[in-house]
Amino acid sequence: GGGGAAGGGGTGGTGSRAAGPALAAAGAVALAAAVTAGGLAVPVRTAAADTVRIAVVQGNVQQPGMDFLGRPMLILNNHVEATLELAEDVEAGREERPDLVIWPENASDLDPHRYPQAYDAIDRAAKAVGVPVLVGALVDHPEREGYVENQGIVWDPEAGPGASYTKQHPVPFGEYVPYRDQLSKVITRLQRVPRDFWPGQSTGVMDVGPARLGDVICFEVAYDEIVRATVNDGARALVIQTNNATYGNTGQPEQQLVMSRLRAVEHGRAVVTAATSGISAVVAPDGTIGQRTEEFTQDVVTADLPLRDETTLSDRIGPAPEWVLAMVGLLSCAAAFATGRRGRAHGVNRTDEKRRQQ
């Protein structure tokens, strides 16, 4: 009888211990659901304070892959050609004159500050269309020999190059090679990245004609802190200058466009994706795609871009919910681990007790 009572008490203790991890997990799930539901319940205002007319030029490339640039000036000439055609359409009344034009990342593979032919080509396009052009260009670092900067440059039709943004987060093994001296000796393929990109130190908030835009280059759209800082520094709309030619005919361009849609909703801002070979698109503040291009085509997208000044809840609280959920997850795992250890120790003690009783 006494043994039965002891056994019954042991079963009850095991049940309460087993419930520990389950309760911790349930609490974590409940908190995650509450945070998610709270986010969905917060309205995102998408009304525009005002709008600007934009044109996004997708000049296209000759071939996908690592050798997309081809010979010097090839990609630049494609974008100049498409912009000159836009200017002709404007002069003929077939297209409304935009307030500004956006070119993609790497639209000029030559530094326009060092190569007169690149400077003249860009200047000719800007003068023809008669409005500022945001030009994506590779620019030699002014002080560090051998380094290059990935920039977005505001090119005025009268004053020429002005404000610029330098990509803050170059891609390892794509735009720079970590431990180049050591790795290049054993991985010869790394020589296809001949120069390292130098990172910028500030956000890309610039006045492009009448619009105060936030420039974000390529995969920087994936980094919460870069996009959030750009909006908080005063960007009224976001521009993602990108070159997806090396990822042609893969899911990457669609993936990046989905990221642009996420950022639009997150920050309540219109997002313009300008790509050398596609996908270029205009995303409304609610995440809907207004216009988009096909890949590996030369195209020009025109649209009225809404500009906003209000900030969203996400802008104001930043990464706090992510940290809270991460801590809840870690604490839940720690609680489950500790409970499991106590359970195993109790099981060993009960086994020893039974052996002594026998």
State where each predicted segment sits.
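Enzyme catalytic cores with a strong preference for nitrogen-chemistry domains
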Residues: 1-358
